[in-house]
A protein has these predicted regions:
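Conserved Rossmann-fold dehydrogenase catalytic segment
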Residues: 1-2
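NAD(P)-dependent Rossmann-like dehydrogenase/reductase catalytic/cofactor-binding core
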Residues: 24-130
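Active-site lid/adjacent beta-loop-alpha segment flanking the redox-cofactor pocket in flavoenzymes
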Residues: 7-26
Length: 130
C-alpha cells in the first residue's frame, strides 16, 4: 500500500522510490500512519517479517495494481486501502493526512479517467478558481 498508491499518483515505475527522496518521504508518511493505526489496534507489524520491510525484488519499471488499474481506466481499490485507514483513523482519533491526500488524488484520477474533466467541447465555458 505504501508504495502502490504514491506510484499510481506519479504514474512511474517502482524505481521512483530509489531515485526520489520525495517519493520515499510520501511512502514513509503513509507507512507511519498505517503503523500508528495498527499499533493502536494491537497489531504488531514487526511480526510480518523482514520481507515486508524490504519488499520484493522487482524491475524498476514495475507498475503495481493501482497504477495498472488507472492505466486501464478502471476504478481502483483505494477504498480498501486509504479509505479503510481513514475510517480507522477517525474511529481512533488518529490523523491520517497522507492517506487523506492520497485517497482524494486517486479518486480524482478515477474521475479524470471517467471523462469528468474532458472540456474539449466547452471552449467557451468559463470557470473561476476559488
Amino acid at each position: 500500500m505504501c508504495n502502490n498508491l504514491p506510484q499510481a499518483i506519479l504514474g512511474a515505475g517502482v524505481g521512483c522510490y530509489d531515485d526520489s527522496i520525495h517519493m520515499k518521504a510520501i511512502s514513509d508518511g503513509l507507512r507511519n500512519e498505517l503503523e500508528t493505526i495498527a499499533t493502536s489496534k494491537g497489531i504488531d507489524i514487526n511480526k510480518s517479517g523482514e520481507l515486508s520491510k524490504r519488499g520484493s525484488a522487482v524491475p524498476a519499471s514495475s507498475r503495481y495494481s493501482t497504477l495498472q488499474d488507472l492505466d486501464a481506466k478502471r476504478h481502483t481499490e483505494i477504498d480498501m486501502f486509504s479509505g479503510a485507514l481513514i475510517r480507522m483513523g477517525k474511529e481512533l482519533n488518529i490523523k491520517t493526512p497522507y492517506n487523506e491526500f492520497t485517497y482524494h488524488m486517486i479518486k480524482a484520477l478515477e474521475e479524470k479517467n471517467d471523462g469528468k474533466f474532458d472540456y474539449t467541447g466547452d471552449k467557451d465555458k468559463v470557470t473561476w478558481a476559488k
